[in-house]
Amino acid sequence: MNRPVKGAADKAGKPKVKRKTREELEREARERKKDKKHRGHVAGSRTQEKASTDQRSGQRKAADPRIGSKKPVPLGVLDSAVAKPKPKSKPSAPVENVVAAKPTMSPEEELEMLENDSRLDALLDRLDSGETLSAKDQSWVDETLDRIDILMEELGIELGDDDEEEPQEDMLQLLKRNNPKDAF
């Protein structure tokens, strides 16, 4: 059981590695540090558009991703029916249903609602007490009162102002009385 000698065979098979100088070691360390510094994403890469989309659309300008959609936003029941592009294969019957779905009140219901409006009552009380309303409030009061007048005319309701007027006297009664204020 002979053991091989370690030192003699190992030295003969491998060439001797030259040790690096201090300057070489420092230069390699600087390069490694430089490589580590440049790892990761560049600054602002989250907000940048992908480069692959720019390559596909060659003529298209690079758009700012912060700008939102150009699709119109529906603001109400009628606006949403108008803003939607009409499909060519389907008839326009659903659009008519949307327009007809707008809740309409009878004139009596609308008049009742306007007469019981707490905002209108509060603003009219402020006007009666001598306060000056803002232009916005004043225009709203005027529009609401005009609408009430229109609804009352539609329904054939007359204002209750007739009670304040003096009853008309008969011409014969005036002549018989010989009232001095009626004489010219």
Curated annotation (Swiss-Prot):
Residues 80-95 have a biased composition (Low complexity). The keyword Iron does not apply. Interacts with Der. Residues 21-32 have a biased composition (Basic and acidic residues). One of its GO terms (biological process) is ribosome biogenesis. The keyword Transferase does not apply. Residues 1-107 are annotated as: Disordered. It comes from Pectobacterium carotovorum subsp. carotovorum (strain PC1). Pfam families: YihI (PF04220). Keywords: GTPase activation, Ribosome biogenesis. This is Der GTPase-activating protein YihI. A GTPase-activating protein (GAP) that modifies Der/EngA GTPase function. May play a role in ribosome biogenesis. InterPro entries: YihI. Belongs to the YihI family. GO terms for molecular function: GTPase activator activity.
